[in-house]
């Protein structure tokens, strides 16, 4: 049973669009069959709380305020991001208006005992004792009595199949510490079997997956399953490590601490060539390329929110304008799928 009960701290949620507090282009979607309405553009917190961030805490908090003013009500972090830094920043930013935002975090990487645990590698624990400990620590850092969406961080197939893990999550929901639970797949793209099992067998409210126009598998296979299971698919890395938002124009632009640090020069060059083959999606709507990319993703009805990554207020505002731009039609979406099937007519690296 996925719906939160009164005992689990169910609360009426007013979306930013309906609160009258924002002049915004952002729109809102319901997450599966829950009572959560999230902004179609959500904010990934890791770029503001890890080694990728070179600014101050005050500058990070200012970007959170900017996002909120733009109508963003959905913020996604992980306890391992900055070793708790992401959660602490969210706690400070929304201490006075907690009921107006939806906070998602992740647990699983045991950075408390393993200095090498960083959200990509290192020790992962999914036993009941650890999960409970990690959730309590996250609640303290977030300064809240409940987590809206708790995600199991990069679960192995063994973890996904472990009844005790999901029984622990259900118990935490009944205790009111979390409202809903899901899984965040990783590291990187892939993990098809884990995702399908979590949706079909574990009642995951959300499934977070790395997905972009250049890396559509296995993400696109999740959409059909999500329709059946009423799961919300949260898209991470929507700009393909900076290729699709213009952050990366060549191998030299790859920033330390970002997704693209794991990419080879050959991958970057191939990805840039593919991006060039997609220029028509911008021209067709007379919008910016990042806006076109986001609008294509919003074609999928199982996607309640796209978790954008940015450290720039102007870029964030550009992203938040995407939902109001003209819709793509079925034939255009089909053409993108055909280009992907042909590898965009670009030789493989």
Model-derived features: where do they sit?
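Short, acidic/polar
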Residues: 54-67, 126-142, 189-198
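A short, structured active-site edge motif that brings together acidic residues
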Residues: 100-112, 209
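Active-site mouth loops of central-metabolism enzymes
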Residues: 46-58, 117-129, 158, 188
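Beta/alpha (TIM)-barrel catalytic core signal, keyed to glycine-rich beta->alpha loops juxtaposed to Asp/Glu
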Residues: 155-348
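Conserved, mostly hydrophobic/aromatic
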Residues: 31, 43, 60, 75, ...
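Acidic (Asp/Glu)-rich catalytic clusters
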Residues: 33-35, 92-99, 139-143, 173, ...
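Active-site groove signature of glycoside hydrolases
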Residues: 139-158
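N-terminal binding-site loop/beta-alpha segment at the start of enzyme catalytic domains
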Residues: 6-105
